[in-house]
């Protein structure tokens, strides 16, 4: 069965899309730690990020860099942090999180509750900065 993230890429489940190329896809995390929290995934369905081939892992990181630079423009911050957990969804993903402090990277923090309009505005701001 396809992962929830493959179903997002296929358009079967809605998302707030940020960017896409032939191999990778970026969309907002639905339970964001901060505004601008974005996930980058390979379209290829692989659970563990370190099971990607060297070439695909390197290309995913380069794609994530483009998204991270756009997040930093759209949401001024000290730096955009990157994390990989993958304990919940078995489809490799990089979390990109604009940080004002180390505390913004604590996954145990309560998550933001945003309206659909707010998610849409955040995704368009990042897309526009790409
Ligand atoms: P983890 O696998 O531990 O890195 O966590 C999975 C992340 O995916 C969590 O931050 C979730 O909020 C996020 N997530 C799960 N389902 C969706 C979805 N349908 N759209 C956007 N983000 C999601």
Regions found by a protein language model. Give the residues of each.
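HIT superfamily nucleotide-processing domains
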Residues: 1-130
């Amino acid at each position: 069965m396809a992962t929830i993230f493959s179903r997002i890429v296929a358009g079967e489940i809605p998302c707030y899309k940020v960017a896409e190329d032939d191999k990778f896809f970026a969309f907002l995390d639905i339970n964001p730690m901060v505004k601008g929290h974005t996930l980058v995934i390979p379209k290829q369905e692989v659970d563990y990020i370190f099971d990607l081939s060297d070439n695909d892992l390197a290309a995913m990181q380069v794609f994530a860099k483009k998204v991270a630079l756009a997040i930093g423009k759209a949401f001024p911050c000290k730096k955009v942090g990157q994390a990989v957990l993958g304990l919940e969804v078995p489809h490799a993903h990089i979390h990109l999180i604009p940080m004002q402090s180390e505390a913004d990277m604590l996954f145990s923090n309560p998550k933001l509750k945003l309206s659909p309009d707010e998610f849409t505005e955040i995704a368009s701001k990042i897309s526009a900065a790409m």
